[in-house]
């Protein structure tokens, strides 16, 4: 079966999710969109050399059973998506890809292989099948880069260099928070780390912080770390960096921003929430993604996902 790789049409997305050096022993026939590796200076010929076929975007939709798109497919591609195709990538069906699921995923019976770092799952119709064969945290390097990149990018666009007098709160202890800590600590500010069990301490001291960096993803859309009421207590000009880009969940009311317009002001506070910040350091993040996905995703035969869905449909009957 054929797995086609598309250039993501997400704003400012420069990551290349498959490098020629990682194309080894795959069972699927790989079809690469023309210019796929251009941002890294990788020619189409380099993909051909390792056994890939080069094709146009439209041809890939027409001829490939599986479609890989790093970010959720946009409306301009909807007309090309065929009934029952396998869509692989960061679709985030319950988050930024919810509209895609409503307009394409469910109506066209698509098999969505969502490569969430912590909970990779297959979405089909109204069913969610955990991919337990993929280890949780399998692309942790990209998450670390997300924390690092978000912090550096936010500070640069906020326009003020942190000092030893700058008070910083970092929420969480996972990969994203670790990356954020690595970045902000270079300025030698006054840093406090808060975890899920110590959030009450954060709430007691909200007014003290100049920068708050979130590295936690919340599963419950109705439960927030920083509510609107909490945010009203923050000091004027406080910079809130949602490095986890959790779209209004961890930080109530926060919205996604873009690399070209990364910060907005609301009630005297500044918010940053770029949901593809690792693309800022796209050379390192491309390698991290390509390595992890090649090992755990691309090497898997597409027939496997069809078999999983067949088992689900048998149970339905």
UniProtKB/Swiss-Prot annotation:
Binding-site positions, NADP(+): 172-177
InterPro entries (alphabetical): AlaDH/PNT_N (IPR007886), AlaDH/PNT_NAD(H)-bd (IPR007698), CEOS (IPR046951), NAD(P)-bd_dom_sf (IPR036291)
The record's section on CDD domains has: ceo_syn
Segments spanning the bilayer are none
Known EC number: 1.5.1.24
- Which biological processes are named by the entry's GO terms? ornithine metabolic process
Q: Which domain of life is it from?
A: Bacteria
Q: Which reaction does it catalyse?
A: N(5)-[1(S)-1-carboxyethyl]-L-ornithine + NADP(+) + H2O = L-ornithine + pyruvate + NADPH + H(+)
* SMART domains noted in UniProt: AlaDh_PNT_C, AlaDh_PNT_N
Q: Which Gene3D superfamilies match?
A: NAD(P)-binding Rossmann-like Domain
Q: Which positions in this protein are listed as binding pyruvate?
A: 15, 71, 92
Q: A single Gene Ontology molecular function, please?
A: N5-(carboxyethyl)ornithine synthase activity
Give the keywords, sorted: NADP, Oxidoreductase
- Report the sequence similarity comment from the record: Belongs to the AlaDH/PNT family. CEOS subfamily.
Q: Which PANTHER family match?
A: ALANINE DEHYDROGENASE
Subunit structure, briefly? Homotetramer.
Q: What does this protein do?
A: Catalyzes the NADPH-dependent reductive condensation between pyruvic acid and the side chain amino group of L-ornithine to form N(5)-(L-1-carboxyethyl)-L-ornithine. To a lesser extent, can also use L-lysine as substrate (yielding N(6)-(L-1-carboxyethyl)-L-lysine), and the D-isomers of the 2 basic amino acids. Can use alpha-keto acids other than pyruvate, e.g. glyoxylate.
Name recorded for this polypeptide: N(5)-(carboxyethyl)ornithine synthase
């Amino acid at each position: 079966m054929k797995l086609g790789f598309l250039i993501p049409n997400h704003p400012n997305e420069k990551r290349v999710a498959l490098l020629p050096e990682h194309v080894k022993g795959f069972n699927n026939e790989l079809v690469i969109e023309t210019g796929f590796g251009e941002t890294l200076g990788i020619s189409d010929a380099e993909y051909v050399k390792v056994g890939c076929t080069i094709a146009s975007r439209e041809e890939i939709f027409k001829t490939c059973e599986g479609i890989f798109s790093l970010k959720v497919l946009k409306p301009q591609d909807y007309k090309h998506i065929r009934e029952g195709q396998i869509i692989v990538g960061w679709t985030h069906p319950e988050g930024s890809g919810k509209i895609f699921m409503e307009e394409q995923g469910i109506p066209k019976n698509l098999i969505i292989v969502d490569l969430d770092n912590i909970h990779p799952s297959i979405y089909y119709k109204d069913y969610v099948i955990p991919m337990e064969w993929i280890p949780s945290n399998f692309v942790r390097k990209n998450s670390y880069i997300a924390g690092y990149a978000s912090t550096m990018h936010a500070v640069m666009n906020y326009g003020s260099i942190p000092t030893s007098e700058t008070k910083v709160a970092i929420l969480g202890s996972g990969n994203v928070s670790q990356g954020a800590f690595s970045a902000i600590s270079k300025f030698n500010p006054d840093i406090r780390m808060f975890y899920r069990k110590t959030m009450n301490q954060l709430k007691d001291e909200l007014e003290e912080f100049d920068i708050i960096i979130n590295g936690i993803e919340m599963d419950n859309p109705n439960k927030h770390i920083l509510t609107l009421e909490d945010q009203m207590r923050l000091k004027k000009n406080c910079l809130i960096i949602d490095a986890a880009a959790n779209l209004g969940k961890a930080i109530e009311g926060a919205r996604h921003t873009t690399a070209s317009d990364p910060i907005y002001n609301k009630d005297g506070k500044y918010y940053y929430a770029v949901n593809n910040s690792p693309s800022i350091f796209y050379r390192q993040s491309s390698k991290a993604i390509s390595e992890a996905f090649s090992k755990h995703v691309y090497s898997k035969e597409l027939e496997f996902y069809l078999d999983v869905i067949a088992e689900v449909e048998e149970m339905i009957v």
